[in-house]
Amino acid sequence: MESIYLQKHLGACLTQGLAEVARVRPVDPIEYLALWIYKYKENVTMEQLRQKEMAKLERERELALMEQEMMERLKAEELLLQQQQLALQLELEMQEKERQRIQELQRAQEQLGKEMRMNMENLVRNEDILHSEEATLDSGKTLAEISDRYGAPNLSRVEELDEPMFSDIALNIDQDL
């Protein structure tokens, strides 16, 4: 059982150590073999530490890569979000401009409607005034103007001018002074 244990745990170490003793041929081979085994153990321990350190560095590198990928994804998402917000803001601005344009059009239509109503009212008034003037002109015509008979006298009409009254003249003099 001891030989199996020695072969399993110390077989490679003892084989290499004895080969080294045979190659170097020291004065005290037992002491040399003992020192060589200590050095071998130290080398194995250092190799294990180096392997652990390499594994740790590899894990840290993988974590750094994952973190970098995550940061890139976050930046991409943030950029996408900013673009969406900008698009939304532009859409809202366009809607606001469209709403203002519609309000301006409605105001213009209302103003145009008011102007058209006023024009229609003025037109109706003007027509009423024209009809009343025509009626007054017709009533103010002389019999000769109304009748188209041959031989009716054709006299021109003379309009009377308002003569200034004495009080109007006095007011004009006061204003001149």
UniProtKB/Swiss-Prot annotation:
Gene Ontology CC, one term: radial spoke
Keywords: Cell projection, Cilium, Cytoplasm, Cytoskeleton, Flagellum
Chief subcellular location: cytoplasm
Tissue: Brain and testis. Accumulates during late stage of spermiogenesis.
Cited CDD domains: DD_DYDC-like (cd22966)
Subcellular location field: Cytoplasm, Cytoskeleton, Flagellum axoneme
Function field: Functions as part of axonemal radial spoke complexes that play an important part in the motility of sperm and cilia. Plays a crucial role during acrosome biogenesis.
Family per similarity comment: Belongs to the dpy-30 family.
Subunit structure, as described in the record: Component of the axonemal radial spoke complex 1 (RS1), at least composed of spoke head proteins RSPH1, RSPH3, RSPH9 and the cilia-specific component RSPH4A or sperm-specific component RSPH6A, spoke stalk proteins RSPH14, DNAJB13, DYDC1, ROPN1L and NME5, and the anchor protein IQUB. Interacts with SH3GL3.
Protein's recorded name: DPY30 domain-containing protein 1
UniProt organism field: Homo sapiens (Human)
